[in-house]
């Protein structure tokens, strides 16, 4: 219910302003190859993410109707489906921006924070990689910012749980360890996929997210 209560107003507003749409990628489907192949990106973005968008729009219409009828039981019944598809849409929207075919480096402020909290940048990469690879079933590895404690944190979430809604952390960097993110190319070699993904991390985007999180 807490997730539902926090997001019901967003549902109503979304219905008023229009439907959710699939975000356009900031690069071509083949731009991240050979780390992420063109075929995988086409399916992952154009099929899987599109399905989350379609399902989210459908469930929002149903929830808006139930809310207008004051049918609380129906709203609660739909909330799990809503949370799953909203999380899938939100997580992937961040994930695409977190990737880039162009090499980049973290900002001085972000790199300093990482080194202070994880002893070194390389240790941070090892820790987040291990956490992501260790996800049981489907889920995500995340670098987030804890505004209350004013520090970075890494953690894993299951399925499509949206990081900020379930943990309070501001999402900075996502590692998608659902099988559909890599299986067509790397089969069951999730570890190789996670390790290779550091080469296409968009540190400009991640650093911008960190700067915004720390200044507000």
Swiss-Prot record:
Binds 1 Mn(2+) ion per subunit. It catalyses: 2 superoxide + 2 H(+) = H2O2 + O2. Mn(2+) binds at residues 44, 92, 176, 180. The keyword Acetylation does not apply. Residues 1-18 form a transit peptide. InterPro entries: Fe/Mn_Superoxide_Dismutase, Mn/Fe_SOD, Mn/Fe_SOD_BS, Mn/Fe_SOD_C, Mn/Fe_SOD_N, Mn/Fe_SOD_N_sf, SOD_C_sf. This is Superoxide dismutase [Mn], mitochondrial. It comes from Glossina morsitans morsitans (Savannah tsetse fly).
């Amino acid at each position: 219910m807490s997730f539902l209560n926090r997001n019901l107003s967003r549902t109503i507003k979304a219905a008023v302003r229009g439907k959710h749409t699939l975000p356009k990628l900031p690069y071509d489907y083949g731009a991240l190859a050979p780390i992420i192949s063109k075929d995988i990106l086409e399916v992952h973005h154009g099929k899987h993410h599109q399905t989350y968008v379609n399902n989210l729009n459908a469930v929002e219409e149903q929830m808006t109707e139930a809310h207008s009828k004051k049918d609380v039981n129906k709203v609660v019944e739909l909330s799990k489906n809503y949370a799953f598809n909203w999380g899938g849409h939100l997580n992937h929207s961040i994930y695409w921006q977190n990737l880039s075919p162009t090499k980049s480096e973290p900002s001085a402020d972000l790199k300093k924070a990482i080194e202070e909290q994880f002893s070194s940048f390389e240790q941070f990469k090892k820790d987040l990689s291990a956490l992501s690879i260790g996800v049981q079933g489907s889920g995500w590895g995340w670098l987030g910012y804890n505004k209350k404690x004013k520090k970075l944190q890494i953690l894993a979430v299951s399925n499509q749980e949206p990081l900020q809604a379930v943990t309070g952390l501001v999402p900075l960097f996502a590692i998608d360890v659902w099988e559909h993110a890599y299986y067509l190319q790397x089969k069951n070699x999730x570890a190789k996929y996670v390790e290779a993904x550091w080469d296409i991390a968009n540190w400009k985007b991640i650093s911008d997210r960190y700067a915004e999180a720390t200044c507000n």
